[in-house]
Amino acid sequence: MFVYKRDGRQEKVAFDKITARVSRLCYGLDSDHVDPVEITQKVISGVYPGVTTIELDNLAAETAATMTTKHPDYAILAARIAVSNLHKQTEKVFSTVVQQLHDYVNPKTDKPAPMISDKIYDIVMKHKDELDSAIIYDRDFTYNFFGFKTLERSYLLRIDGKVAERPQHMIMRVAVGIHGEDIEAAIETYNLMSQRYFTHASPTLFNAGTPRPQLSSCFLVTMKDDSIEGIYDTLKMCAMISKTAGGIGINIHNIRATGSYIAGTNGTSNGIVPMIRVYNNTARYVDQGGNKRPGAFAAYLEPWHADVMDFLELRKTHGNEDFRAREMFYALWIPDLFMQRVERNEQWTFFCPNEAPGLADVWGDEFVALYEKYEKENRGRRSLPAQKVWYAILQSQVETGNPFMLYKDSCNRKSNQKNVGTIRCSNLCTEIVEYSSPDEVAVCNLASVALPTFIKDGKYNFQKLHDVVKVVTRNLNKIIDVNYYPVPEARRSNMRHRPVGLGVQGLADAFFALRLPFESAGAKKLNIQIFETIYHAALEASCEIAQVEGTYESYEGSPASQGILQYDMWNVNPTDLWDWAELKEKIAKHGIRNSLLVAPMPTASTSQILGFNECFEPYTSNMYQRRVLSGEFQIVNPWLLKDLVERDLWNEDMKNKLVMLDGSIQAIPEIPQDLKDLYKTVWEISQKTVIDYAADRGPFIDQSQSLNIHLKDPSYGKITSMHFYGWKKGLKTGMYYLRTMAASAAIKFTVDPVALRARNEESNEENKKPVIKNGKAEISAEPTKEEIDIYNEKVLACSIKNPEACEMCSA
């Protein structure tokens, strides 16, 4: 049987050659568990006449990836094979690749179609010796297989459909795209990114150095006007933003409700639902950057709006299709007054913004005064018990995970932009809280630090974290100036306020590396100190930039200009890790260059590239699927797998148990308690702890955070108590998604069917819902009246005799 080599020559398939190639890439791996011969045997069995060496390499990489559940080193080997394969197909020298990308001619039109901007091309050519020699290609081999495949699929630039960049080329392109002629800063950024200390957000990785460098992730839009012109002008603006890979949060509080009078036509309004359906179709049509990811809009509405009950139905899977818009995401911008009325079981009045103007433009006591004034003047459309509205919110969340919950008064009260005006909404992922208006589209550029990379010899290196965050802050500040803005309103806003968003990834991995169970005192302290370090470093860097470039335009009158920082607004004292008094003196003297700095975002794609868990989330499972173009691969939490291999507990039987138990190790008797404590999944961690951690880091987050809530068996009582707990803790984002576990598990492959049947019988019993009646727990397969009566204190009560009924404290 013959194989085609890269130069087109034919050669006989040689078992030994394949084994030797795989063996060469096994350096530093555990030779007791990683077997090159076994991989070669599986590759040979898939060979067909005329196969190319590129296809052989792909097959070898995927074969190694399927064996990851045997030992975590197989994931590293799979990546090495895939990276080595790419290296053989691409140019080595960075400046040569930049030249190829810049000089590209579209074969269909025969016209130049450069993928690198003239400015960046000129800089690279001018400094090519320095830039070419700074790149260390071995760092490509530090990615795991799935991280590398994510890069290959969406991030590395292509010529005629073939990948032209290596990961190191992409990182250097991003560094030069941000820093331009400042080669020293570009190489510093390259080194930190290539060593996995931090990463910029996806749009920055996609577009830096290209002719249209749209590097921002988030845009916050306010409707231009409640008119056909205003609605469609705003729609066009959203399309232009989405076209260049921006996610959008749009507030629609000021759009008149169904049945409102329209003076221009002497007719009545159809309300927000038909309008949202138009926006929904735009989100579907305008994808982000040539199918890299679909367009995404989140609509924000305050709960006093007369159409809010229809708004809550829009994402549901059943009902009249004319009243559904499922590609949009939905969020509530909730004033404290609404929460208070739900808690006190009082009436809630709905208004049309055309008949009761100005409610979206005020917050706090001013909002309460205006809302109650309109109530007294009988301007309301109708009123309902606030708890009935609350029930509709919960029902929608259980069915769809939406609407997101953000607390308007906390977002405004604790914002460094409160001197600019009332903040009307957040973004698509609920972590950006910035001022927007009809003539200002708020923008945010994001980056995240990889928390596990700062662990050395079992200790957390806060000084290194501080140093790296200062570099990232300077980068994000530079992006504001080099960025391409899809609409002028975005440029105006970003130049006036200069906000940036620093986030994290891999907090759960950092806990694993330091052997800290998620709910331990050590983890609680580390969570606070990490975010305190990030906030301090970002402020210090921003202050140092202000010394040279001056403060941002709207600085005067901001809380920071009066010596008030985020933790002051929370009435919290920081730890003694950093000298805050000295920093406040510096800020009083020089000011800061950026109005906002810290915003932990979901990091869904970039954390997959670096091989860490998302943002600050616990692991959702110790066994999960990773999908690449060639198929799905089963992955075991690499930290757990390493521990089980070291303790000689990992075998096929253990793997089957893990699959059978949905990635949980709590019911596996052979696994010792210290590992059970360390590797609890998010479903096994008290959500009260998750909310506590969010509140603990809140004083050092001047924007907000993408906080998901996970509930295994959601009941209206549990969700209610969580929302109220988060609201009373002072969170700005009370909830991003509500994540619930499917009642029926997916099909379990490679599992002993007898064992599975026994497990399913047990879980059927467990899934019956516990309900409290007259202080006693009863089991019911159906939700009862008491369970739906979310305001009945007994349902919310915590009972030591009935721990399963309360998920807030895990009893």
From Swiss-Prot:
Under complex allosteric control mediated by deoxynucleoside triphosphates and ATP binding to separate specificity and activation sites on the large subunit. The type of nucleotide bound at the specificity site determines substrate preference. It seems probable that ATP makes the enzyme reduce CDP and UDP, dGTP favors ADP reduction and dTTP favors GDP reduction. Stimulated by ATP and inhibited by dATP binding to the activity site. It catalyses: a 2'-deoxyribonucleoside 5'-diphosphate + [thioredoxin]-disulfide + H2O = a ribonucleoside 5'-diphosphate + [thioredoxin]-dithiol. The active site is at 427 (proton acceptor), 429 (cysteine radical intermediate), 431 (proton acceptor). Keywords: Allosteric enzyme, ATP-binding, Deoxyribonucleotide synthesis, Disulfide bond, Nucleotide-binding, Oxidoreductase. Residues 1-92 form the ATP-cone domain. The keyword Manganese does not apply. One of its GO terms (cellular component) is ribonucleoside-diphosphate reductase complex. The record marks 806, 809 as: Interacts with thioredoxin/glutaredoxin. The record marks 736-737 as: Important for electron transfer. It is an enzyme of class 1 (oxidoreductase). ATP binds at residues 5-6, 11-17, 53, 57. DTTP binds at residues 226-228, 243, 256, 263-264. Pfam families: ATP-cone (PF03477), Ribonuc_red_lgC (PF02867), Ribonuc_red_lgN (PF00317). Disulfide bonds join 218-444. Its EC number is 1.17.4.1. Heterodimer of a large and a small subunit. Interacts with SPD1. Provides the precursors necessary for DNA synthesis. Catalyzes the biosynthesis of deoxyribonucleotides from the corresponding ribonucleotides. Belongs to the ribonucleoside diphosphate reductase large chain family. This is Ribonucleoside-diphosphate reductase large chain. It comes from Schizosaccharomyces pombe (strain 972 / ATCC 24843). The lineage of its organism: Eukaryota, Fungi, Dikarya, Ascomycota, Taphrinomycotina. The gene is cdc22.
